């Protein structure tokens, strides 16, 4: 029997609050039905990078000079490798995302740096998928969120070129690829941990906290090109 399918288009609306940035769609994740999960998407090198994340974390902390230790202590569980808790899923919506950079940069930067809050968005897509976009600032990670263990999710994506241009997916430009983990570290508190690429041990750690309810953007419909 022939069935008629009615498709309703729902317009995406954002809150009028000035602090809430626009929501944009990132490029689709590669689809590989034979090998579901993030392992089917990322390179062997990046799989190895995540496998060695505890060692990278330990090396970055050990390299922090004594005079900077108070900055590590001040961040509490955010910089504690074993602080991940169960049920890591991030509810869709707007988040404040604050970057703490852990590691000695090539340009002589301090080994612990904390940056101001910016805005990120976790978006609900088709087939129970989630996407992540950093919407403001200069460093603009974005990608797809994959289930992993009971204490972490995996983000696979790329460093986007500009605010609002989220066209790069993982693998499009390997030099811009990124992988990381999302963990819950407390009530209404998550972190996104991105290990550095290259020889220097270091981490970009984003503290994610939900934007207050009255400042949340109305959730747009799922992107039709989701995998």
PLM features: what roles do these ranges have?
Residues 14-16:
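C-terminal motif of bacterial Sec signal peptides marking the signal peptidase cleavage site
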Residues 105-116, 155-181:
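An anionic, turn-rich surface loop/hairpin at beta-sheet edges
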Residues 87-154:
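Mid-length scaffold segments of soluble, non-membrane domains
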